[in-house]
From Swiss-Prot:
Residues 575-677 form the tRNA-binding domain. The keyword rRNA-binding does not apply. The gene is metG. CDD domains: Anticodon_Ia_Met, MetRS_core, tRNA_bind_EcMetRS_like. InterPro entries: aa-tRNA-synth_I_CS (IPR001412), Anticodon_Met (IPR041872), Met-tRNA-synth_bsu_C (IPR004495), Met-tRNA_ligase_1 (IPR023458), Met-tRNA_synth (IPR014758), Methionyl/Leucyl_tRNA_Synth (IPR015413), MetRS_core (IPR033911), MetRS_Zn (IPR029038). It holds the Pfam family Anticodon_3. PROSITE patterns: AA_TRNA_LIGASE_I, TRBD. This is Methionine--tRNA ligase.
Amino acid sequence: MTQVAKKILVTCALPYANGSIHLGHMLEHIQADVWVRYQRMRGHEVNFICADDAHGTPIMLKAQQLGITPEQMIGEMSQEHQTDFAGFNISYDNYHSTHSDENRELSELIYTRLKENGFIKNRTISQLYDPEKGMFLPDRFVKGTCPKCKSADQYGDNCEVCGATYSPTELIEPKSVVSGATPVMRDSEHFFFDLPSFSEMLQAWTRSGALQEQVANKMQEWFESGLQQWDISRDAPYFGFEIPNAPGKYFYVWLDAPIGYMGSFKNLCDKRGDTTSFDEYWKKDSDAELYHFIGKDIVYFHSLFWPAMLEGSHFRKPTNLFVHGYVTVNGAKMSKSRGTFIKASTWLKHFDADSLRYYYTAKLSSRIDDIDLNLEDFVQRVNADIVNKVVNLASRNAGFINKRFDGVLAAELADPQLYKTFTDAAAVIGEAWESREFGKAIREIMALADVANRYVDEQAPWVVAKQEGRDADLQAICSMGINLFRVLMTYLKPVLPTLSERVEAFLNSELNWDAIEQPLLGHKVNTFKALYNRIDMKQVEALVEASKEEVKAAAAPVTGPLADFPIQETITFDDFAKIDLRVALIENAEFVEGSDKLLRLTLDLGGEKRNVFSGIRSAYPDPQALIGRQTVMVANLAPRKMRFGVSEGMVMAAGPGGKDIFLLSPDDGAKPGQQVK
C-alpha cells in the first residue's frame, strides 16, 4: 500500500565550478538519486535539487589562467556538470548556480537577519598576505602543518586528516599556494558569525537523533574543544557577493554555498510559478522534510555553521544529514598517473551508467565508510548479478512466450506461494532502501534472483517445450519466470533506470511498487530484445588508458592573451580616474641612434607638443609610415629622463612584443587633445 505522502526536499553537496565531475563525486549523486527514486516510487512529493558552487578565489585565479572571465568559466562548467549528471540519470528537478540573483538575495537576507539579531561581530585581524602576488591569501591558498594533529600539507581552513577547522594564521610553517612565498601578516577588518551563541541549540540538535552516530560523536568532540567565531568575510580581489555596506569585503564562499540549496529551490519554484512552496519548505515550523547528502569532509560546515545560520535567521534546520565516505579505486586513492582518477564523462565513453550505479549501490550502507571501486570485481559483479541472475531470467523465458504463445502470458500463476514470497520481501527491501542500507537491499534482491533461477532450472522449460501436449505447462512456467523477473526489476528500478525503461517496454507495463501484488496474467508482452550486454576487462583497460591520456592533455599549458598576461589586481575607479588619456597626432617618427628598440615620436596634443620615446621599433621598421596617424597617449605621466633625452608620456599599444605590437588609434573624427573616457 502507498504510504502517507510526505513532502521531501533532497540536496547533494554543490560541486565546485572549477573542475570536472569524477567518480568520487558520482558516489554521492548516485546514492541520493537511488534514495529519491525510491521515495518517488512510494508516492512521496520529492524535490531533488543541486547547483554549482561558483564563488571563491580558486575560480577567480583559474579563470585568469584560462584567459576567460569567471562568469564564462562557471557557465561552461555548469553545462559540463549537468551533461555528466544527465548521463548518469541523476533525476534533478533543478540544477542552478550559487552565482545567481536568488542566491545573492537570500545571502544578503540571512546576513542581514544575523546582523540585526546581534550574531555578526566586526574586528580587525592579522591576515596572511602574499608579498609576491600582492593579495590576501584565502584559506585554501595557504598550506602548512595542521596545528591540531600536526599533519603536513594541510589547507588553511581545515585539516583533511583530523577534520579540525582553524584560522590560516594558526598553520605551522605556512606557504602561499599561489607563489610559494612565505606569507607576511597584515591587518584587515573582518566580519564574524558568533557560532558559540548556538552551542546549546546545536548540542540539543545533535542529541535529537537527526544525525548518524558517527557524525554525532565527532560533533561532541568539537563541542568539548569549544566552538569559535567563524570568519565569514574575505578581502578583494575575490569572486563572489560583496557584503552589503562593506565595500571591498565579500562573503566567504562557505557562507553563500549552502544558501545555494535555498537559491536553487527558489529558482525551481519561480520556474513553476509557485509562490507558496519556498516558504512552506523553509519556514521555521515547516513539516516538510529536508535532507542533505554530503561527504564526510564537509560535515563541520553542514552540522555546525549551516544549522546555526538557519536558526539565527529564522529558517528551519535540516531533518537529517546523510554522510558518506570517500571513493578509492583498486584499494588506493584515485591516481592520475595510474589512470584511476576517472572523470564521469570518460566513464560513459566506455561503460553504461547503470553499471556504476549498481556497483556503488551494492557497496553502500548508512555508515560513513569508504567505498572501493575494484575494477576487476566490478566487471565480475555486474556480469554475475545484472546479466546472469536478472536479465538472463527474462531471456530464458521470453523466447518461449514470444514464439509459442504470441507474447501472451498464462492466465494463472504456476506457483502462487512462491510469488507471494517475492512480494512479501517488499517490506524488508523497502525498509533497506528507506534507511539507506543499500547493500542489504541488493543482497535481498539477489537472493530472490537465485530462487527465481533455481525455479526455472528445476522446471526446465527447454525440456517441457519438446514434450507433446505440455503447452499449458510451458506457458505457465515461463509466465511465472517473467512475473518473478518483473518483481525483481521493480525492486531494482531506483538503481537501474535505463534497464528499467527497456524492461517496461518489453513487459508492456510500468514497474510500479504498489502493483507487484497483482501479477501480469493473460497479459501480452512485446518481443524480447537484448536488455543488457556483458562487460569485460578490455573495457576497463581502455578506460584506464583513456584517463591517463586525458591527464597528459590537461597538463598541456594554457595559452592565450589572458593566460600569458593575467589581468592585474583590481583597482578602484578613483585610481583609474587619475590616468589622463588623450588623442595625439604623430607629427614625426624617427629611429633613435644607439637603440635597436626605440622610436622617437613627436606628438601634437592640439596645441601642445610632446616628445615620447616608445619601444615599438621591432613592429614599425619604417617610422615614416606612422607620420600623420593618430594614437592614444598617457598625457599626465611624469617625464622620464633617458640617455637619449626626456620622454614626456607614453603611447598606448597592444600585443606581446616583437613584431606583434599594435599601436592603438581612435576612430575617425577624434581630434588631437581630446580626452579618452
